[in-house]
Regions:
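Amphipathic alpha-helical interface segments
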Residues: 1-2, 6, 115-118, 201
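Extended amphipathic alpha-helical interaction segments
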Residues: 48-158
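Polar/charged, Q/E/K-enriched amphipathic alpha-helical segments with strong coiled-coil propensity
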Residues: 29-56, 176-189
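Soluble, cytosolic/nucleoplasmic coiled-coil alpha-helices used as oligomeric scaffolds and tethers
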Residues: 34-37, 41, 72-75, 79-82, ...
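Solvent-exposed, amphipathic alpha-helical segments
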Residues: 16, 20-23, 27-34, 102, ...
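A cross-kingdom marker for long, charged
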Residues: 126-213
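Solvent-exposed, polar/charged alpha-helical surfaces in well-ordered, non-transmembrane soluble domains
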Residues: 12-22, 26-29, 53-60, 64-67, ...
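Post-signal peptide N-terminal segment of secreted/secretory-pathway proteins
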Residues: 1-43
């Protein structure tokens, strides 16, 4: 069964995602009823053990499908953004509106790349340099200076991404103190030249971009 109208690449995974989600949801609901009604007191947890195994099986089936579904959605969004960028250029030329979206597309590509456990540092550094140019062009296009917050956060993300990629490229190890900080969710972003630090700047840039709308 295909979705109508077809939305490739999501059409190929949506039905599998729905089926897996329904199966997982049904098991969770059954578990909730079982424990809410305290039925385990009547069967010495016999059904509870079976439900637990079913839950693990459903979860194992759901997770890869959910990842594929998310990836398909991201692919569609990426294509739409590129199409919108082209439309903006055709309607307005390379205005701040154009460059701000170009910055976001570039930054997202970088963030997706450097979030991986292993990546090509030279390729990442090239993308970071391209982002640096786009940020400078966005700043130049912002004649009024009204969009300083976004330009500043984009510049900060570009810098933090560059510092992290440089660390990976040059194989600079983290200190013992840094390693401890990276294990703490409250301080993880404080580590210099780290992905969490770059990610924090990325999220702030996204917030500032959304405020432009």
């Amino acid at each position: 069964m295909a979705l109508m109208p077809a939305l490739q690449p999501i059409d190929g995974v949506a039905v599998s995602y729905i089926d897996a989600a329904v199966a997982l949801g049904n098991t969770i609901n059954e578990m909730d009823k079982y424990y809410t009604q305290e039925n385990y007191k009547d069967d010495a947890f016999a059904k509870g053990k079976t439900l637990h195994q079913t839950f693990l099986k459903n979860l194992e089936a759901f997770e890869p499908v959910a990842e594929s579904y998310h990836a398909a959605i991201q692919e569609i969004n990426d294509k739409r953004q590129l199409a919108e960028l082209k439309n903006i250029e055709e309607r307005e030329g390379k205005t701040f509106h154009y460059y701000s979206l170009a910055v976001m597309i570039s930054a997202k590509q970088i963030n997706n790349l450097i979030s991986q456990n292993k990546f090509d540092a030279e390729a990442a550094m090239k993308k970071v340099s391209e982002l640096e140019t786009l940020v400078a062009q966005a700043k130049e296009a912002d004649k009024s200076g009204m969009n300083f917050s976004f330009i500043n956060s984009a510049s900060q993300y570009q810098l933090e991404a560059k510092k992290y990629v440089r660390r990976i490229r040059d194989k600079v190890l983290y200190s013992d103190w840094d390693k401890e900080q990276l294990q703490d969710a409250n301080s993880i972003w404080m580590v210099d030249d780290s992905f969490p630090r770059a990610l924090r700047e990325y999220n702030e840039m996204v917030d500032d971009y959304n405020s432009l709308r």
